[in-house]
Amino acid sequence: MNYAKLLAAGALSVLAAACSQPDTTAGAGSEQAGAPRVVNVYSARHYRSDAAIYAAFTEQTGIEINLIEASGDQLIERVRADGPRSPADVIITVDAARLHRAEEAGLFAQSDFSEFTPEIADNLIDPDGYWIAIAKRARVLAYSNQRVQPDEVTTYEDLADPRWEGRICVRESGNAYNQSLLASMVARLGEEEAEAWAAGIVANMARPPQGGDITQIIGVAAGDCDIAITNHYYYLLMQNSGEAANRAAAEAVTLFFPNQETSGAHVNISGAGIAVNAPHPEEARELIAFFLSDEAQRMFAEMTNEIPVVEGVEWENERLDAVMPFVADTRNVSELGDHNATA
């Protein structure tokens, strides 16, 4: 997707109500002649790809980035507390449920994302136009090459089967990625069946939940468990890790994308939206358009092993190539937020 064409098409034009916000920030906005152009970014992402994207954006547009980084929940609370005086222009967070939470709090302005389809699938765009995905990640399985046969692994639902008793590693249930996976099960199976599935997972745990996704993969490699739930890119990062122990752990397991013959693998996102009180809405629009350019999408794929949201983007990453393509769940990711409270 060409960045210049995105801007020319007005693909991310903010609705008039958002654009008419009074500019109360000194030197803010592109309308003040001679003032430096800036965009204030509140981001829950902490990846090196983003630093490279910001640098490329500034080089091409002259717009300087003022970056605030914190957890998604902290950013939401900060913007909410600041109210109409918030300096945030763009809010970026990981996990569709957090985007939903920010939307429910009234932190996003509505935007017209229609020009991005069909290059970006409808299920990756908020139906009400408050946010759009900028990168994808799949929540998948990593199983032992020695203790699990490939035909043993099929679906998420199968993990609740008693034959997996004492064999599963997973991080704690309050983790956003696990909550969204369970929310997807609620959306697909209904609350009662999803609750039974979650109880089955707990019954089959090899150990109490601990650590992050990399810890789960290491647990499989060490023999603490036979199969783990993880985001796909952690495994790919371990393959190229500077630590020999992480590389060895990755070699001892196989990454598996479940539900390939049914609903498709569960996909979550990083997403961005323009803040409702953005003092620089046009600069915010340009930054989000740049995130969706081929250049930025390629950086996500090559630097953090994330999956581009724009169809047809080419990248050079053999590790990501090895797990692509796969069948993904096509349910709108906004439903992960809709069912998060139940999960």
Name each model-derived stretch.
Residues 15-18:
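C-terminal motif of bacterial Sec signal peptides marking the signal peptidase cleavage site
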Residues 20-23, 27-101:
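Early extracytoplasmic/lumenal segment of secretory-pathway proteins
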Residues 42-45, 108-117, 127-128, 131-132, 143-145, 151, 157, 244-266, ...:
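Short beta-strand->loop
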Residues 86-91, 109-141, 157, 167-170:
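A structural signal for short loop-to-beta-strand junctions that line the ligand-binding cleft
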Residues 96-107, 126-154, 182-183, 267-273:
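Periplasmic solute-binding protein
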Residues 173, 177, 184, 188-258:
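Ligand-binding pocket segment of bilobal, Venus flytrap-like solute-binding proteins
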Residues 270-331:
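Mature extracytoplasmic/periplasmic domains
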